[in-house]
């Protein structure tokens, strides 16, 4: 298989600004026809068990999975929040937005120089009964990491060029970013409890992205063989941080990693729940597809009980 060009790898990675631009320019999935300009999509179950507010980034919103709403936030009608609300009888307020960081929980999120989503925490009320928070990946620069590692893989596909780049000088830059994000997640959780004191709060972790039992599938997924273990460990550390902050701040952690092992980006169509560089089903690159969102919903529903 011919090697992908660096420019192609960069253009196809998970920078959600790029995904949003594609959606805006091409009208992907008829966003306008599905209520694209709303600030927070609301879906009501027939028999409401209360109000559920979903906060988070693109792993919550489900970019490019039909049907889309929420404008440039790229929310799917079958993301895990929507599925959980329907299954458990909640009225859903989906405030999630592709590209969100912890800062966007309390601040406007902007793109193209315009506000695309108000502060996600503004969706909370004193009557909110369920809150999920899926955040942190963009704080550590997930999109930039994938883009950087894809480019580095072309220089040494059988080595570990990305690991070397992020650990130069003996300091693991990604681990440091995870540690720096922990207090931000804690602050968000405290604010959730302040605004919705009666709500059950769940922190949703990130699913398995890279294979556990191999060194990857370069060049189909352009991560150098020697970098797969490092990036997998980085995700493990991110999830561990989220679990720790949930436990320390009155929330329940939802493990979506364990139940998705074996459904990573290197698996064949129908088995993989995370899409690779070139998606084979409607979803953003390196993000859950509809099967992945369904698996995350199942994990969340199991945690809720």
List each language-model region with its residue ranges.
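Oxyanion-hole/transition-state-stabilizing segment in secreted/luminal serine hydrolases
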Residues: 63, 114-177, 208
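Secretory targeting and sorting signals
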Residues: 1-45
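Catalytic His-Asp segment of secreted/periplasmic serine-dependent ester chemistry enzymes
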Residues: 207-305
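Serine-esterase "nucleophile elbow" of acetyl-processing enzymes
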Residues: 45-99, 150-156
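A structural motif corresponding to the C-terminal end of an alpha-helix
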Residues: 84-92, 183-200, 234-255
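Charged, often glycine-rich, active-site loop that binds/positions anionic groups
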Residues: 100-118, 264-280
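Structural recognition of the beta-strand scaffold that forms the well-ordered cores
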Residues: 51-56, 60, 91-96, 129-134, ...
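Short amphipathic alpha-helices and their capping/turn segments at secondary-structure boundaries
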Residues: 40-51, 115-132, 185-200, 301-302
């Amino acid at each position: 298989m011919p090697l992908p060009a660096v420019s192609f790898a960069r253009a196809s990675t998970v920078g959600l600004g790029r995904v949003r631009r594609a959606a805006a320019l091409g009208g992907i999935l008829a966003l306008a026809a599905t209520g694209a300009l709303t600030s927070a999509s609301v879906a009501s179950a027939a028999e409401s068990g209360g109000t559920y507010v979903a906060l988070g980034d693109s792993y919550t919103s489900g970019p490019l999975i039909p049907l889309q709403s929420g404008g440039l936030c790229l929310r799917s009608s079958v993301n895990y929040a929507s599925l959980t609300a329907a299954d458990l009888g909640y009225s859903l307020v989906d405030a999630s937005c592709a590209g969100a960081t912890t800062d966007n929980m309390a601040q406007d999120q902007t793109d193209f120089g315009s506000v695309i989503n108000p502060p996600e925490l503004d969706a909370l009320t004193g009557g909110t009964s369920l809150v999920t928070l899926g955040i942190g990946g963009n704080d550590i620069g997930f999109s930039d990491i994938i883009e950087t590692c894809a480019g580095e893989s072309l220089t040494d596909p059988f080595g570990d060029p990305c690991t070397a780049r992020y650990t130069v000088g003996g300091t693991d830059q990604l681990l440091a970013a995870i540690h720096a994000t922990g207090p931000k997640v804690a602050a968000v959780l405290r604010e959730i409890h302040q605004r919705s004191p009666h709500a059950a709060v769940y922190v949703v972790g990130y699913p398995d992205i890279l294979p556990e039992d191999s060194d990857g599938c370069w060049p189909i997924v352009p991560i150098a063989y020697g970098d797969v273990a490092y990036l997998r460990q980085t995700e493990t550390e991110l999830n561990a941080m989220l679990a720790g902050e949930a436990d320390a701040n009155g929330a329940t952690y939802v493990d979506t990693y364990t139940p998705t092992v074996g459904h990573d980006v290197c698996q064949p169509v129908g088995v993989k729940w995370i899409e690779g560089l070139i998606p084979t089903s409607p979803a953003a690159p390196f993000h859950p597809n509809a099967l992945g969102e369904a698996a995350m919903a199942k994990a969340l529903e199991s945690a809720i009980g």
